[in-house]
Swiss-Prot record:
Coiled coil: none annotated. A motif (HXXXXD motif) lies at residues 344-349. Belongs to the GPAT/DAPAT family. GO terms for molecular function: glycerol-3-phosphate O-acyltransferase activity. It is an enzyme of class 2 (transferase). Keywords: Acyltransferase, Cell inner membrane, Cell membrane, Lipid biosynthesis, Lipid metabolism, Membrane, Phospholipid biosynthesis, Phospholipid metabolism, Transferase. GO terms for biological process: CDP-diacylglycerol biosynthetic process; fatty acid metabolic process. Transmembrane segments: none annotated. This is Glycerol-3-phosphate acyltransferase. Residues 1-29 are annotated as: Disordered.
Length: 863
């Protein structure tokens, strides 16, 4: 932002913005004195009313080049009474001729000496088919015509830019910020409010004069001369506005027309019109409606207003918002097209991440949001904060798909940063969901079409201690349909939200992913050349899938371990979700030791609080209940809180994969060799990696298991007879504290192995060629629900269909199962081997229960 007294205009000008030419003469002169022709009475009266509210900063300070006796006409960006009065005051302050006193001869054919390129629109958006305003200024056309008629006439145009409240201080009220200057063309009432609130911070910029005569002497046809002069003036106003208030980010106004003008959209409109049997104009309006439905309406004043508002909200409901690893991101991000890809746990993700970026002085991205959030008032505010809305499903709607793709392409080509959630929706279980590659595909294709600016994907982990949507997640996991968002529900829940305390929020920036590096690895045949709009290389889909999984893996590698995560890991390992205080402290201590001594990655952050402080914090936010007892206090979680805690356990489940695997192997076995433990772990790893987005190769996972073994031996959880591969590892036989802690660690992965065994058991029981993948999913879900009822109460996510789907998909990728010509799954004896391996982990009673309840497919009744 330029300093208040610095010149805003470049020293050099275009050929039409010529320096002052003293040659020639003009028969137009200004009145010698304002006493000869006075300003209109209405202007004097209104000026006196407005003067106390205005404090003008005029640039440049010296007006010698304007006040040399030659006739000048001022050019404003748009008409408006307030603008006219401000210009008049600026002219009086600098002793320039008044814009309200016409030139002799009246070349404008109006009683004034100023004109505007455009007028404020008076159209009503509620009235369809209303004609818009003129495409050019009548006054400017009249002025050019007067110069053609009178050869001696040489009026100079002086463009004048007016900014009211361009940069309100941070100490200014948020209401004043809302009415500060931006790129939008505002109405009269809003302009008056802007003057009342920000008029004392008004800037008036006079530009160098433009000779109309020299423009005419270029010899262009009249219509082209008019268009060129208007184009020069518009370019000037835009350049000055960018200098004063920053670039125009109101993409809705700038990008919609560009989207509709692309070749791909025009072709899609033609194809859609042909399919529907409609005319092109009707289909074009349909495409335009799609573009307006999608497009953001970025507003800097609204962003600044939201900062004032949400600073108070966050301080009220959160105990702080911490941001980690942002400095390293700021070092490498310049010069890149940034795509923020955060985890998606809550509706608050949209607001929190934008708030953090704003506070870190990082430009806000354009955020992809589901159309379900386009509610009255809320949707408008989200659009103003940079959100653009897309439909949940676009299959079968080719026109919409093309418009959306081109909109994203325009953003990428324009250098706008993006933000989207590749999980497609909020996680109801606390795990990262399997990624959807649609938005990544659009981003990659947009880059391949115009590979000018390198793309950087920035994974971000957002961690909560308490969720606003916790109750609704419980209902949905229990089988109730998702409630449709409504503005009334939003307003109804605001008082409830403001009364709650939601603990601390942590935002961790993961390791960025450079798209060029991914393409160099997976698509070496691409050499940086631009691809056509409809060109889809064979490697594109596999590259997008790899990129999506890598993003999820990097998000998990930047996890934050907060107090509630540690409590959930400990308490949910017991049948009644309760522990004595001393046992709970010991278990939390062990979990922290595993994380600190066997670091998952250098971007994982861990709460610095002691176990005692963690327990006190959980009691403060009403997650933990203390039951006093003469033999020692018992700490527990009750009812729905226990199910909700599974959400926070799942947030960090992946961090304990290796340690939980080792502990699981000793839950039902007292003795096992190192080599057997590692061999079984490596065999199970592909399924765990697919479900939990783990970063290691199989060899790296084997090394990690070895490190866990050494730690468990040091902690006394396991006993080692030696360091050779064949040397046995043993655990204690009695119910010691070490055995208790080992079993508690194992519990976090127990349910995953139970799901795997359910799937294999149902396949084996039904035989090859009997079940399709979808039929197997449904039977697995039913069996898991029944097991939960009969054997032990579990969280609803235990029978989540998506988890079974992921396991079945991995079986297919490893060729352990494959479809026949009728899409029925086939398998061989290798599946029996996998079932035998499960005997090492699962107890006999549990295996027997699973085998007994595993359902068979319903066979059709004989005819």
């Amino acid at each position: 932002m330029p300093k208040k007294n610095s010149p805003l205009l470049p020293k050099e000008t275009t050929t039409t913005q010529s320096s002052v030419d003293t040659s020639g003469s003009s028969n137009l002169t200004w009145p010698v004195s304002e006493h000869t022709i006075r300003r209109p009475l209405w202007a004097r009266l209104l000026g006196q009313i407005l003067d106390p509210w205005l404090d003008l900063s005029i640039e440049p300070e010296h007006s010698v080049q304007y006040n040399d006796g030659r006739p000048i006409i001022y050019v404003l960006e748009d008409y408006g009474l307030c603008n006219t009065l401000i210009l008049d005051k600026a002219c009086r302050k600098t002793k320039l001729p008044s814009p309200l006193i016409p030139l002799s001869g009246n070349p404008l054919q109006r009683k004034r000496a100023y004109l505007a390129l455009s007028r404020r629109s008076s159209s009503n958006s509620l009235i369809p088919n209303q004609r818009g305003g003129k495409t050019h200024s009548d006054s400017l056309a009249n002025l050019l015509q007067a110069h053609r008629i009178r050869d001696t006439l040489d009026v100079h145009l002086v463009p004048v830019s007016i900014f009211i409240g361009r940069t309100p201080d941070r100490q200014s009220g948020w209401f004043a910020v809302l009415f500060s200057e931006n790129w939008a063309l505002v109405g009269r009432f809003r302009r008056i409010l802007a003057i009342l609130l920000n008029g004392r911070n008004t800037i008036v910029c006079f530009a160098p004069p433009i000779s109309v005569r020299q423009t005419l002497n270029e010899g262009l046809p009249p219509e082209r001369t008019l268009r060129k002069l208007q184009r020069v003036l518009r370019t000037h106003f835009r350049r000055i506005r960018e200098t004063v208030i920053g670039p125009d980010l109101s993409t809705r106004r700038l990008l919609v027309d560009n989207v509709l003008a692309t070749e791909a959209v025009r072709e899609a409109i033609g194809a859609q019109a042909k399919r529907d049997g409609t005319d092109l104009s009707e289909t074009w309006r349909k495409a335009q409606a799609y573009a307006w439905e999608i497009a953001a309406d970025y507003s800097s004043p609204v962003i600044r207003s939201a900062d004032f508002l949400f600073s108070h909200v966050w301080n009220r409901i959160y105990a702080g918002v911490l941001v980690h690893h942002v400095d390293s991101f700021k070092e490498i991000s310049p010069g890149h097209e940034i795509v923020y890809v955060p985890s998606h746990r809550s509706h608050m993700d949209y607001l929190l991440l934008s708030y953090c970026l704003y506070k870190c002085s990082i430009g806000l991205p354009h955020i992809v949001a589901g159309i379900n959030l386009n509610l009255p008032v809320v949707g408008t505010l989200l659009r103003k904060c940079g959100a653009f809305f897309i439909r949940r499903s676009i299959k079968g709607n080719m026109l919409y798909s093309v418009v959306l793709s081109e909109y994203v392409a325009q953003l990428v080509a324009g250098g706008y940063s993006l933000e989207y959630f590749i999980e497609g929706g909020r996680s109801r279980t606390g795990r990262l969901l399997q990624p959807k590659g649609g938005m990544i595909m659009m981003t990659v294709q947009a880059f391949l079409r115009q590979p000018r600016r390198p793309v950087l994907f920035q994974p971000i982990y957002i961690g909560y201690e308490k969720l606003m949507e916790g109750t609704s997640y419980l209902d949905e996991l229990s089988g109730e349909p998702k409630k449709k968002e409504s503005i009334w529900r939003v307003f109804w829940n605001i008082p409830k939200v403001l009364k709650q305390k939601y603990g601390q929020v942590v935002v961790n920036f993961g390791e960025p992913i450079a798209l060029n590096d991914v393409l160099a690895e997976l698509a070496p045949e691409w050499e940086g050349q631009a691809l056509n709009e409809n060109e889809k290389p064979a490697w594109l889909s596999s590259t997008v899938n790899h990129l999506a999984r890598q993003i999820q893996t990097r998000i998990n590698s930047a996890a934050d371990v907060n107090p509630i995560n540690l409590l959930a890991l400990a308490l949910l390992s017991t049948p009644k979700h309760a522990m004595g205080e001393a046992d709970l402290i010991a278990q939390i201590t062990l979990c922290k030791k595993i994380l600190l001594e066997l670091p998952y990655s250098n971007r994982v952050t861990i709460t610095p609080h002691t176990p005692e402080r963690i327990i006190a914090h959980a009691e403060q936010i009403n997650i933990l209940t203390r039951v006093h007892h003469p033999l020692g206090d018992v700490l527990r979680v009750d009812g729905d809180n226990a199910v909700l805690l599974s959400y926070f356990r799942n947030n960090v489940l992946h961090l304990f994969t290796a340690s939980a695997w080792v502990a699981c192997c000793f839950k039902n076995n007292r003795r096992m060799s190192r080599i057997a433990l590692i061999r079984l772990g490596v065999g199970m790893y592909p399924f765990l990696q697919a479900e939990l987005f783990l970063p290691w190769t199989e060899d790296q996972f084997a090394q990690h298991i070895q490190q866990v073994i050494e730690l468990f031996v040091r902690e006394g959880l396991l006993l080692s007879a030696g360091n050779e591969e064949e040397d046995p590892l043993t655990r204690n036989t009695s119910q010691t504290d070490e055995v208790f802690r080992l079993r508690a660690i194992s519990h976090s992965l127990q349910q995953a192995f139970e799901r795997y065994y359910i799937t294999i058991s149902i396949l084996v029981k039904n035989g090859p060629g009997t079940l399709s993948a979808s039929e197997l999913e449904s039977l697995c879900q039913l069996a898991a629900q029944r097991l939960s009822l009969l054997y032990a109460s579990t969280a609803p996510e235990f029978f989540d269909k998506g988890l079974f789907r992921g396991f079945i998909q991995k079986l297919r990728e490893l060729n352990l199962v494959w479809p026949d010509t009728y899409s029925k799954l086939l398998f061989d004896e290798r599946l029996d081997t996998s079932a035998k391996d499960a005997q090492v982990i699962l107890g006999r009673e549990l295996r027997h229960t699973i085998e007994r309840i595993s359902p068979e497919a319903t066979k059709p009744a004989p005819k």
